[in-house]
């Protein structure tokens, strides 16, 4: 039976999330990365469900996740603080040893891109439970992934284009595959086409004779057939 992953694209709709370099909204980046992540998982024969596929408010995310009954769940987020802090961090449940393993696998693959590691972490609320609702209320082993700090120019450089958002998503997909013990299948390279713009000309020789009359006879035949022919 295929493994199942729930992908929560952080924020959305009226909730822009963090605001980064050039006024970029976290909600737009999380959606883009989540879509690329979904495509990567599909390529690896992993089933998935997304919390949202358009810019809509994040409604009933946990309920959707629990109804789907995934093997694991991942919430995609991006950080912001004071424009100086950098790095990726992955949160998991206080009460889940498996969560720590899962978080470590995902973080290691993000860090392999060159992002600074801020570690795998837990966060406790005043009641001694998990701080993040997504981690606290989700039945499956769940992570909240903070890919980088988008208000830091160096960190934002890891996600500032669609191509880089795809690279980030692929790193997360690798981490998921490693944890689920499923082979990660890289995207096949697109075939390239080449155009020959060479102006080089090639000559074709037909026949070689000791008797010039024989050469002239062949020349006449070639010209009669519509070919240019010279004797050298």
Residue ranges and their predicted role:
Residues 3-4, 28-192:
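Active-site-proximal helix/loop segments of hydrolytic enzymes
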